[in-house]
Amino acid sequence: TLYFIFGIWSGLLGTSLSLMIRTELGQPGSLLNDDQLYNVIVTAHAFVMIFFLVMPVMIGGFGNWLVPLMLGAPDMAFPRMNNMSFWLLPPSLTLLLSSAPVESGAGTGWTVYPPLSSNLAHMGPSVDLAIFSLHLAGISSIPGAINFITTIINMRWEGMMMERLPLFVWSVFITAILLLLSLPVLAGAITMLLTDRNFNTTFFDPSGGGDPILYQHLF
């Protein structure tokens, strides 16, 4: 229920951002009169919709509710881990929203692309807040994925083979596995970006021997 409430609230927020984007694009002149502000709205809209609407509602809400029902299990394998997974999301959303009013906001597109988010183009804490927000959202989804995989493998009714599972359970299972495979790569990319910005490393800076294309590959 908490996942649904959180998802609905974030969805309303994301929809309001979406309406601003549509209004800006749906008329000949400029509505906001500020390209940077428009980019900030696009960036925030993408993050809010993916990490705080689709994932909590589809996986957190429907997943936690329907998967145990479809398996004949009394609950998820690790209910407390589920709880921990949820309570990392509100601070993550808070960090993302606080990145918008700080300085000129993180208007880098939803990938937080390095040339745009270098310390020259984006000085100060705005992009860093967006990156920390991504970290928290990622950390939140890892225990959730482990929980789903463990539940589906270990908590089926006796006699319920894997090939008899409903397709919804299979879809959650495969999604969780793919999430665990892909998240460390994304975490590595944004951690390297964070150190590039704050500790003068040159993972993505060609002048220091780094590779500017590497980030796109990782992402």
From Swiss-Prot:
Component of the cytochrome c oxidase, the last enzyme in the mitochondrial electron transport chain which drives oxidative phosphorylation. The respiratory chain contains 3 multisubunit complexes succinate dehydrogenase (complex II, CII), ubiquinol-cytochrome c oxidoreductase (cytochrome b-c1 complex, complex III, CIII) and cytochrome c oxidase (complex IV, CIV), that cooperate to transfer electrons derived from NADH and succinate to molecular oxygen, creating an electrochemical gradient over the inner membrane that drives transmembrane transport and the ATP synthase. It comes from Hapalochlaena maculosa (Southern blue-ringed octopus). Fe(II)-heme a binds at residue 45. Residues 23-39, 107-128, 188-219 are mitochondrial intermembrane. Belongs to the heme-copper respiratory oxidase family. It comes from the Eukaryota. This is Cytochrome c oxidase subunit 1. GO terms for molecular function: cytochrome-c oxidase activity; heme binding; metal ion binding. GO terms for cellular component: mitochondrial inner membrane. Ca(2+) binds at residues 24, 29. Signal peptide: none annotated. It is an enzyme of class 7 (translocase). InterPro entries: Cyt_c_oxase-like_su1_dom (IPR023616), Cyt_c_oxase-like_su1_sf (IPR036927), Cyt_C_Oxase_1 (IPR000883). Keywords: Calcium, Copper, Electron transport, Heme, Iron, Membrane, Metal-binding, Mitochondrion, Mitochondrion inner membrane, Respiratory chain, Translocase, Transmembrane, Transmembrane helix, Transport. The chain crosses the membrane at residues 2-22, 40-60, 86-106, 129-149, 167-187.
